[in-house]
Amino acid sequence: MENQPKLNSSKEVIAFLAERFPHCFSAEGEARPLKIGIFQDLVDRVAGEMNLSKTQLRSALRLYTSSWRYLYGVKPGATRVDLDGNPCGELDEQHVEHARKQLEEAKARVQAQRAEQQAKKREAAAAAGEKEDAPRRERKPRPTTPRRKEGAERKPRAQKSVEKAPKTVKAPREEQHTPVSDISALTVGQALKVKAGQNAMDATVLEITKDGVRVQLNSGMSLIVRAEHLVF
């Protein structure tokens, strides 16, 4: 018996499941909500195929159900399906709301990462611009003085005028922030700031959770932030 090829990543496992169960899984486009307990159905149906283990199946399912396209598909009126595409009941409101929050948090994380990357790019561009704009000091040729003839009177040297050094302009003081050391001391509605690279965005505390603090930015977006990214 020939050895079956082994799937090495969760993406490869998802591609295999989409080919094996096309009425349930999809490799692209909006995904359909899965039946509750579908993991055990997968174990029963694909046990031994492609050398798949339970750990691989569980990791692939976690990646699949946390993807944006799957979360978009979890909406009011949508129907869960089993491995063969048979309907298994409509989604309840609690699952729809949970998926909506997951999608909002995922988008907020991506936006925060992009803002941090853009801030770093601006800093790098500003640093490069300062180096290019700095003028190089040209050396002036030293004036040649005629040699004094023998017997000629020695003229007193003219005193050099002392050049005043240009006043240095003090750089504006950076705004000092106090890090949040204990999130349990925060209160709902309290104003603070969220660090994103070198910038700090104003925010308001909405909720204190076990994973961090849910805050709302001035833009209206809400996200969960860990304590090390919060300052006063």
Swiss-Prot record:
Keyword Chaperone (UniProt): yes
Cellular component, GO, one term: cytosol
UniProt-recorded Gene Ontology molecular function terms: RNA strand annealing activity; RNA strand-exchange activity
Region span, Disordered: 105-182
Keyword RNA-binding: yes
Major localisation: cytoplasm
Domain of life of the organism encoding this protein: Bacteria
Record Pfam families: ProQ, ProQ_C
Compartmental location: Cytoplasm
Function: RNA chaperone with significant RNA binding, RNA strand exchange and RNA duplexing activities. May regulate ProP activity through an RNA-based, post-transcriptional mechanism.
Family the UniProt entry places it in: Belongs to the ProQ family.
Record-given protein name: RNA chaperone ProQ
Organism of origin: Escherichia coli O7:K1 (strain IAI39 / ExPEC)
Lineage: Bacteria, Pseudomonadati, Pseudomonadota, Gammaproteobacteria, Enterobacterales
Gene coding for it: proQ
